[in-house]
Amino acid sequence: MSERQSKYFDYQGIVISSTGQDNQDSETDLVYLIQAHGKAAPKNIMYGVSKCAFVPTNLERNFDNIEEAKNLERRSKIPLKFGEVILWNESDCDHDKRIILHIKREKPIYEASSSRNGLILKVGGVIQPTSTTSFWTPLCTVTMPETEATRAEPDVWLYAWIRFETTMKSGLDPFNMTATFESFDSCDPSDQARVCEAPWNAGSPDSKFGVWRPDPKPADSDDEIDIEPREGWHLPEDKWAEVIKMQLGLYVGERLLICKELSQFDFIIPLQKPFSRGTDKTLIYPAVGEYFHFSAIWSMQHNGFLIYELQPVPLLRQHVTSVNGNLLTRVVPASIRGLFVDKEGTLGLIDDPHHLLSFFEFHPAGYEFLKAMAEVRAVRTSENKSVRYRIVRTSGMSIFENWLRDTQFVVGPVKGIRINEDTVICAKHPNVYFKIPNNLKEGIPIGGGVQFVGKRQAGVDSEIMITECSPCPAFTCKNYSVSGDTRLFQVYLKPNCDHEQLAESDSMGFVDFRELETPCRGKFLAWVRESITVNDCRRAATIMEVCSTAICPPLIAMSANSSRATSARTTPAGSSIGSRSSIQSRASAATSVSSNRFVGPSSRRTPSGTPQSSTSSRV
C-alpha cells in the first residue's frame, strides 16, 4: 500500500465467520462490509479474506533490522477473530470474486464474547420509537422479544449482545446472514449523542447535520440592563439543569420516576436492571410505589432526564398499590379548587378527570376534613406538565356513595359562564357541570355571564340543574365558533406562581395551559376551549384548556375526540343519572403501570396493539 493509502481506507468490514473447509486453500474468513468510502455501506455484501492478505509486503524496503521484519511477519500471520474490524482500499480487493487481498487491522471496536447459543458481539444501538421491538444498530436492525423491549426506553443509546450467524462458505456464495438479539448489556450516559445516528433522528438539532439557533446576546457586557421586573409580573423559577444529582423520586412504573420538587420533568430509567436487596442478595426489579435517590442527565430526544444512578431508600415507607399497578392513597381537596392532594402530601396535585369526586366539597363533613380512598395513575409530562397524577377509581366510600344516592341540595347564588347549549361552569365549583334548561336560556347566549341557583337531584353524579338564573354582564366574554359545538372563549387569566401548568380565570376558575408557555405577567388574554376527551375522559387537568394566547382566534383542527363528539355534556357516563359503577369500571380500564419485581416489567405492545415476540432478523 502507498503512503497515501495507509492514512485513509476505502472500506471497513467486520469478521463474521471462518470460510468453509472446501475454500480454505484460498480464503480464511468471511467479512461483512459495514462502511464504504466513509459512508454506510450497501447492505448484504460479504467478502472473503485471501490467504495472501496475511503476508506482509515490502519488508526489505521498510526495515533494515531483520528482527523488526520478523516481528511484522509474525503479527501479520495472526489469524483474524470473530468481531475484529479490518480496513482495505479499492486496489486491495477483487469485487468480482468478492475477495480481499490486503488488509489493515483496526483497533478493537466491538467487544466479542460467547453464549450457549454461539458467538456474540456487544453493539450499540437505539430502539425505534414507532416499533418498540425493533433495535437499530449501525450494523443491522434486529427484532427483540417483548420481555426485553419493556426493559428499555426508545431513543436511548443502549449496548446489547447480538449473535451473527451465516451459512456462507465463501464470498461468492449467495448472501446469507442472520442477526439475533441476545440481551441488553448497559447504557452509558456519555454516549447519548450517538442517538442522532439513527435514521429517524437525522434532522435532530443534536445531529451533525443540524444547526443550533443562536440566542441573541449583547456584544458588550455594558449593554446589559439590570432592573427589577414590574410589580405584578411573575417570573417563573428556572429549575432546569443539565445534570440532576441525588434527588428523591417515586417509582411509578414503566421505567418512570417522579420527583415532587421537579414535577415538570420526567425522570426515565433508560435500561431497567434488577438490584439486590437484603441479606439473601435476591435480585429484584423496582416496584411501583418505592422511593429512590437518583442522578440523571438531560436528554433532548425525550425532553426529560435519563437516570444513570439509582439507589433504593429503604427508610421511606413504600406506597400501597392496586392489582392494576396504580397507587392507593387517601386524597383530600387541594387549595386549588377542583384538584386534590394525597393526605401525606407526598405526590403533589391530583386531578379527577372522570368527575368521581366532583360533589366531594358538598358533603356535610366539610370541604377541608373529608378524605377519600382513591386509586391514582401517574402520567408523563406529555400528558400533564405539573399535575402528574389522575384519579381512576375510588373505593371504601360507602358513606359518601349512600349520601350521593339519597341527598338533594341547593347551590348558589353563584356566578359563571355558559360554554355550550346546555352547560354552565363557575370558578367556585370548577369540577361541576351546571345544566341550564331550555326555559331559562333566553337572554343568556353562549359565552354570556350568568348568576344562578342550582339544585342537585339524588343519584346524579356530576351535574346540577339550574333553577333560577339572570344575566351577569361582568362575566360575559368574546367567543368564536370553530365548528358545531366547538367554541373558543377569550378570557383574562392570571398565572399560578406554584404550578406553571395552571392559570386562573374569574369566571371559569383554573384552566390548563397544556404545552403552552405561561406569559410572565399579571393578567393576560387567552383563548380557551372545553378540554378534548381522550380514552373517555378529559385530557386536561381542568374542564377548560388554553389553546392560544394570541389576540386573533387561532385555527383549531376538528377532532373526533372532542368532548362534544363523544358524550352528551352531562355525567361521564353520558346520562344525567349515570351509574358510578360504570364510570369507575371505565376509569380503571385506563392504561396503568404494573410490574413484577422478580421477572421484570410487564409486556409492552406495539402501537398497532399486536404483540411481537420474534427475536431474529435476516439482514
UniProtKB/Swiss-Prot annotation:
Major location category of this protein? cytoplasm
Where found, per UniProt?
Answer: Cytoplasmic granule; Cytoplasm, Perinuclear region
Is Secreted found in the keyword set?
Answer: no
Record note on disruption phenotype: RNAi-mediated knockdown results in sterility and disrupts the localization of pgl-1 to P-granules at 24.5 degrees Celsius.
Q: Which Pfam families match?
A: OB_DEPS-1_1st (PF24343), OB_DEPS-1_2nd (PF24342), OB_DEPS-1_3rd (PF24339), OB_DEPS-1_6th (PF24341)
Is Cytoplasm set as a keyword in this record? yes
> Known InterPro entries for this protein?
OB_DEPS-1_1st (IPR057139), OB_DEPS-1_2nd (IPR057143), OB_DEPS-1_6th (IPR057144)
Gene Ontology CC entries for this record: P granule; perinuclear region of cytoplasm
Coiled-coil portions: none
Listed under GO biological process in this entry are: regulatory ncRNA-mediated gene silencing
Q: What does this protein do?
A: Component of P-granules which is required for P-granule formation and integrity in adult germ cells. Promotes the accumulation of glh-1 mRNA and localization of pgl-1 to P-granules. Involved in RNA-mediated gene silencing (RNAi) in the germline. In particular, it is required for piwi-interacting RNA (piRNA) gene silencing and positively regulates the formation of secondary 22G-RNAs, which are RNA-dependent RNA polymerase-derived endo-siRNAs, typically 22 nucleotides in length with a 5'guanosine residue.
The record's note on quaternary structure and interaction partners says:
Interacts (via N-terminus) with prg-1; the interaction is direct. May interact with edg-1.
**Record-given protein name:** P-granule-associated protein deps-1
> Source species, please?
Caenorhabditis elegans
Q: Which gene encodes it?
A: deps-1
